[in-house]
């Protein structure tokens, strides 16, 4: 099949909605919440116009949305939803249940600060609150990645050695409402790539009746959690295989992380999401000035790519970690994960922790440069949490 792409200028929300259109899930249940709302608005239009045959369920809350897709997935349907911030927090109970039931649900999460005070703009507090829920978590830098990851996530979630739900994270407003060029793949090619869902133990298979969600006490609960752990570990084996097939089909290469100008870099910055575009801009500037700097974008936050970080960051002079979320009373989430991964390497770099952009505060090139300059000048202090763009 010929790979002919359509290059269009769209928002991240429209890009994700079009990926959902091409996937054509059996069921989508959703409740509107800023800045996720345009995703389900676009998709609801596809349903109303008869473009897709998806059963669209408008529910009264995000708790109900996740409950509905859990029920649909357990019945054997390919099910999706989308949310942001307080909506994800309201889902919290059922988010854990979806993972523990091993249901291959795909959920775009348009990242927004959690209340309070109430805030509708971007940070990663919503996703970080669910990082231990058992969901695979992918983070997009661009609208193209948000589109691609939505498609790729279906295959990853439904793989027989994984069977775990996936969150596709895209930064609120920055990506969801920002317009960028995106290459849409042919509908037939996407449908061929995602294939047909092969349900496991569906409730509607009356020839093989099963019970979902029974009481699971100390006689089996522990073993079931161990199975979840093993499934998450399997992602590290399965993801490269699916990513390779994605590259062969669509021409784009994905991995757990994306190194940028890392070949001889002495000082490296690590971050999630759209901020990586600004980091790359500053890396290019500093390279022109003769500084050996680079960046490492984390595409997959859960499971955390520990081995890849150890390989790429061992022996560097310094590593600066940027977090768009905090963990009150502890180290920032991404910094904590990077620090833990590098504890085992032979030549540990100096580490620096920087929190930025809470509540949608802009992160500017001069902020990135300041953090790099601290690293270059040897001014990093391990475990000292610093802040970029904060009035103090």
From Swiss-Prot:
Its EC number(s): 1.2.7.1
Domain of life: Bacteria
Coiled coil: none
InterPro entries, sorted: PFOR_II (IPR033412), Pyruvate:ferred/Flavod_OxRd (IPR050722), Pyruvate_synthase_PorA (IPR053390), Pyrv_Fd/Flavodoxin_OxRdtase_N (IPR002880), THDP-binding (IPR029061), Transketo_C/PFOR_II (IPR009014)
Enzyme category, top tier: oxidoreductase
UniProt keyword terms in alphabetical order: Oxidoreductase
Protein name according to UniProt: Pyruvate synthase subunit PorA
Source organism: Thermotoga maritima (strain ATCC 43589 / DSM 3109 / JCM 10099 / NBRC 100826 / MSB8)
Reaction catalysis annotation: 2 oxidized [2Fe-2S]-[ferredoxin] + pyruvate + CoA = 2 reduced [2Fe-2S]-[ferredoxin] + acetyl-CoA + CO2 + H(+)
Pfam families, A to Z: PFOR_II, POR_N
Subunit organization: Heterotetramer of one alpha, one beta, one delta and one gamma chain.
GO molecular function: pyruvate synthase activity
Upper lineage: Bacteria, Thermotogati, Thermotogota, Thermotogae, Thermotogales
GO biological process: response to oxidative stress
């Amino acid at each position: 099949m010929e790979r002919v792409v359509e290059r269009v200028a769209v928002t991240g929300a429209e890009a994700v909605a079009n990926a959902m259109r091409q996937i054509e899930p059996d069921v989508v249940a959703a409740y509107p919440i800023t800045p996720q709302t345009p995703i389900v608005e676009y998709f609801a239009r596809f349903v109303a116009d008869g473009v897709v045959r998806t059963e669209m369920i408008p529910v009264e809350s995000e708790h109900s949305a996740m409950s509905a897709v859990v029920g649909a997935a357990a019945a054997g349907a390919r099910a999706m939803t989308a949310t942001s911030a307080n909506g994800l927090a309201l889902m919290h109970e059922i988010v854990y249940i979806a993972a523990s039931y091993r249901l291959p649900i795909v959920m775009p999460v348009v990242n927004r600060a959690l209340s309070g005070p109430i805030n509708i703009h971007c940070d990663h507090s919503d996703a970080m609150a669910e990082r231990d829920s058992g969901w695979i978590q992918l983070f997009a830098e661009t609208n193209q990645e948000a589109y691609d990851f939505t498609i790729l996530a279906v295959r990853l979630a439904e793989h027989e050695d994984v069977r775990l739900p996936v969150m596709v994270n895209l930064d609120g407003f920055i990506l969801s409402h920002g317009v960028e060029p995106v290459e849409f793949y042919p509908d037939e090619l996407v449908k061929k790539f995602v294939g047909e869902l092969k349900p496991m133990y569906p409730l509607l298979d009356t020839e093989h009746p099963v019970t979902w969600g029974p009481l699971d006490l100390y006689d089996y609960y522990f073993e079931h959690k161990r199975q979840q752990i093993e499934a998450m570990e399997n992602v590290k084996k399965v993801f490269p295989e699916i990513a390779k097939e994605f590259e062969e089909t669509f021409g784009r290469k994905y991995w757990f992380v994306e190194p940028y100008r890392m070949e001889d870099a002495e000082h490296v910055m690590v971050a999630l999401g759209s901020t990586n575009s600004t980091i790359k801009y500053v890396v290019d500037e500093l390279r022109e000035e003769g500084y050996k700097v680079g960046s490492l974008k984390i595409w997959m936050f859960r499971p955390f790519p520990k081995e890849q970080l150890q390989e790429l960051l061992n022996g560097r002079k310094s590593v600066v970690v940027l977090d768009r979320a905090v963990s009150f009373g502890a180290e920032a989430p991404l910094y904590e994960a990077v620090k833990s991964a590098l504890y085992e390497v032979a030549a540990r770099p100096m580490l620096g922790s920087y929190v930025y952009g809470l509540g949608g505060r802009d992160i500017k090139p001069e902020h990135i440069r300041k953090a790099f300059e601290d690293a270059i000048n040897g001014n990093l202090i391990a475990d000292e949490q610093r802040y970029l763009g904060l009035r103090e």
